[in-house]
UniProtKB/Swiss-Prot annotation:
GO biological process: methylation
Binding site for S-adenosyl-L-methionine: 37, 59, 61-62, 67, 85-86, 135
Methyltransferase keyword on record: yes
Molecular function via GO: O-methyltransferase activity; S-adenosylmethionine-dependent methyltransferase activity
Name of this chain's protein: Putative O-methyltransferase MSMEG_5073/MSMEI_4947
PANTHER family: O-METHYLTRANSFERASE RV1220C-RELATED, O-METHYLTRANSFERASE-RELATED
PROSITE patterns per the UniProt record, alphabetical: SAM_OMT_I (PS51682)
Coiled-coil zones: none
Source organism: Mycolicibacterium smegmatis (strain ATCC 700084 / mc(2)155) (Mycobacterium smegmatis)
C-alpha cells in the first residue's frame, strides 16, 4: 500500500486533464523520444506563468512543445516564449503544436543551439519566468544564467530536481546527482531567492527572486 504522501502525489498527478492539442504534442514527444513534463507539472507551469506576469518567459529544452504549450496557456496574450533546444527537429515538431493551438508566430522565439551559449546572449533582469528542463549535469550553469535573467519578482523553475529520488540518496554521487545538488545549493545560498522543492514530475525546484 502506498504511503499517504505517495497517494497525495499520485492524486495530484492524475487530477489534471490535457486538451487534445497538448495530448497530440505529448504523443509526438513519445514518437521522437523527447521527454515531456507530466500534466500536473504543466499545469503548475501555467499557474506560475500567470502569477509572474507572463510577458517574457525562457524555456531551456523545447522538446516537442508540451511544456511550451502549458507555459503559453498561462502567459499574457502579448507574451513571448523564448525556447531553446539543441535539436532543430524537436523545434520543428514543437512549432506544429504551437500552430495547432493558434499561437501566433510573434509569440514564440525558437532558438536552435546549445543553451550554454544562447543564455549568455539574453538580457539581464528581463524575464518573468525561466524554466529549465535539460540534461541534469548542466543544471548549475543554467541556474546561474537563469537567475541573472530574472527581473525582481520573477521565478526560476528547475525540472528533474529529484532524479527519481537519487538526489536525496546520501550514497549516490554520480555526475547527475552531484550537479543537481550543486544547482540546489546555488539556489539555497542566493539571498535574493526564496526557494521551494515541489514533489511533482521528477521534482521541481522553484525560486522567486526578490
Amino acid at each position: 500500500m502506498a504511503s499517504s504522501a505517495e497517494a497525495i502525489v499520485t492524486h495530484a498527478e492524475r487530477s489534471i486533464s490535457e486538451d487534445a492539442i497538448v495530448a497530440a504534442a505529448r504523443e509526438r514527444a513519445d514518437d521522437i523520444g523527447a521527454g515531456a513534463v507530466t500534466p500536473a507539472v504543466g499545469a503548475l507551469l501555467s499557474v506560475l506563468a500567470r502569477l509572474t506576469g507572463g510577458r517574457a518567459v525562457v524555456e531551456v529544452g523545447t522538446g516537442a512543445g508540451v511544456s511550451g504549450l502549458w507555459l503559453l496557456s498561462g502567459m499574457r496574450d502579448d507574451g513571448v516564449l523564448t525556447t531553446i533546444d539543441v535539436e532543430p527537429e524537436h523545434q520543428r515538431i514543437a512549432k506544429q503544436g504551437f500552430s495547432e493551438a493558434g499561437v501566433g508566430p510573434g509569440r514564440t522565439r525558437l532558438i536552435s543551439g546549445r543553451a550554454q551559449e544562447v543564455l549568455t546572449r539574453l538580457a539581464d533582469e528581463s524575464y518573468d519566468l525561466v524554466f529549465i528542463d535539460a540534461d541534469p549535469v548542466d543544471q548549475p550553469q543554467f541556474v546561474v544564467e537563469g537567475v541573472r535573467l530574472l527581473r525582481s519578482g520573477g521565478a526560476i523553475v528547475v525540472h528533474r530536481a529529484a532524479l527519481g529520488g537519487r538526489a536525496g540518496d546520501a550514497d549516490a554521487r554520480d555526475a547527475e546527482v552531484t550537479a543537481v545538488r550543486e544547482a540546489a545549493r546555488l539556489i539555497a545560498e542566493d539571498e535574493r531567492l526564496t526557494p521551494v522543492l515541489i514533489p511533482l514530475g521528477d521534482g521541481l525546484l522553484a525560486a522567486v527572486r526578490d
